[in-house]
Curated annotation (Swiss-Prot):
Locations listed in the record: Membrane
Source organism of this protein record: Mus musculus
Top-level taxon of the source organism: Eukaryota
Name of the molecule in the record: RING finger protein 223
CDD domains xrefs: RING-HC_RNF183-like
Protein's membrane topology: Single-pass membrane protein
An example Gene Ontology molecular-function term: zinc ion binding
InterPro entries, per the entry: RING_finger_E3_ubiq-ligases (IPR051435), Znf-RING_euk (IPR027370), Znf_RING (IPR001841), Znf_RING/FYVE/PHD (IPR013083), Znf_RING_CS (IPR017907)
Length: 285
């Protein structure tokens, strides 16, 4: 029956293949023709029970890969700054466009400009974080860079009106305009974009009582410091002469360390007795 339905193919299979392999090959060949949407395909089965051919259809144009796919890449939102990942607004996060058409928020570009050394003309050149192409910053600072109107138009309606922002030293300052006529002025808002940290508050130093005014003698004593040293050295030399050198010169002259010679005690007693007798004789006369 199969031979009558497709005689040419079955006769070729009977000639080229053994008898016990003919039926599985025919079954595989018929499965290829019955698949929907495949058209006529040439099937080459390699096993007895060949798998059923599958014909995946083409992907729809513009179809993005599923987020759960391992190879899928998460695309950043166009309304976020690529540096700080903060949403754009109309104050410090205003979308500013560089000369290379890359867009970043105002605060990040102001920090980049503050970190760059000053050029010859006194203006900084900010390199793009993506392509490294330099962009000259105007004299007024980063707030004077061109605003991306294309991204600004995609913001909500209340953020499409750009607020006036200016640079004072290392601070971005803004004075938000009142949204309604009856709203009061909210004052100034600022953010520091400099590299230096704010100074820590120091504790107050206790005030000490002034020292009493020294007298004239103390002032003279402090003024003639060199003369004090000369006097001290002179006194030390005199003491050295009296204590050491005087006994030495006495020993060299007299041969004895005692420079003062004391009289004998007997001679002194006889002298006293003679004097007493002389006074007694004079009294009797």
């Amino acid at each position: 029956m199969v031979h009558k339905k497709r005689g040419g193919v079955t006769s070729w299979l009977f000639r080229k293949s053994p008898v016990h392999n003919v039926l599985p090959l025919l079954h595989s060949w018929e499965s290829c023709h019955q698949a929907t949407g495949c058209g006529v395909q040439l099937c080459h089965p390699t096993a007895r029970t060949a798998p059923q051919p599958q014909c995946p259809g083409p992907l729809a144009q513009g179809a993005a890969p599923s987020p759960s796919t391992p190879g899928s890449v998460k695309v950043a939102s166009p309304l976020e700054c690529s540096i700080c990942f903060s949403g754009y607004d109309n104050i410090f996060k205003t979308p500013k466009e560089l000369s290379c058409s890359h867009v970043f928020c105002l605060e990040c570009l102001a920090r980049l400009a503050a970190a760059q050394p000053a050029g010859r003309s006194g203006r900084e050149a900010v390199p793009c974080p993506f392509c490294r192409q330099p962009t000259t910053v105007p004299v007024a600072g980063a707030p004077a860079l061109r605003t991306s109107r294309q991204l600004q138009a995609k913001l909500p309606a209340h953020l499409q009106r750009e607020e006036p922002v200016w640079l004072e030293g290392t601070k971005l300052c803004c004075r938000p305009l009142p949204t309604t006529s009856g709203q009061e002025d909210g004052g100034f808002v600022s953010v520091d974009v400099g590299l230096s940290k704010p100074a820590e508050p120091t504790l107050p130093v206790p005030v000490q009582d002034p020292a009493p005014n020294p007298g004239w003698l103390a002032r003279c004593w402090a003024r003639f410091r060199d003369w004090r040293r000369v006097a001290l050295v002179s006194v030390l030399l005199l003491v050295l002469f009296c204590v050491i050198l005087w006994p030495v010169q006495c020993a060299l002259k007299t041969g004895n360390l005692r420079c003062i010679n004391r009289p004998p005690a007997a001679t002194a007693t006889a002298t006293v007795t003679t004097d007493a007798l002389s006074f007694g004789v004079l009294a009797n006369n």
